[in-house]
Amino acid sequence: MKKLLSVIFVLVAGFVYSQDVTILQINAEWNKKNNYDLSEITGAVVKFSYLKDQPLDIQNSIMAVPVIVIMDKNGRIRRQFIADISLQIKATHLEIQNEINRIKKL
């Protein structure tokens, strides 16, 4: 019985986790002063990674850092916010939060 409850708990936790929108911020170590503070964002799993830790194909596809990638529960990229020439993301927290809310309604 204990094992059955454990399995059910893991499956439910996995299902609940898979319903989340994921935000991945990728930046370079030399640009860490321009990391975007995502602590105010709700309704999404927030992750951070350095560019050097990404596979080469992803490293080569990123033209500017930092970049914020918003993915739906299926892992599909729904929106990207990319730094401008100042190496900073100009999007507001409200813009990012609104995008998360929009994706969660789909």
Residue ranges and their predicted role:
Residues 1-4:
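Positively charged n-region of N-terminal signal peptides that target proteins for export
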Residues 9-18:
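Hydrophobic h-region of N-terminal signal peptides that target proteins for export
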Residues 15, 71-72:
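Short, acidic, Ser/Thr-enriched surface-loop or helix-capping motifs
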Residues 18-46:
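Local sequence-structure signature of Cys/Sec-based thiol-disulfide redox active-site neighborhoods
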Residues 43-60:
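Short, internal strand/loop/helix patches
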Residues 49-50, 64, 84-88:
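Flexible, solvent-exposed short loops/turns enriched in glycine
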Residues 60-71:
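Structural micro-motif
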Residues 73-106:
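Non-catalytic, surface beta->alpha helical segment in thiol-disulfide oxidoreductase systems
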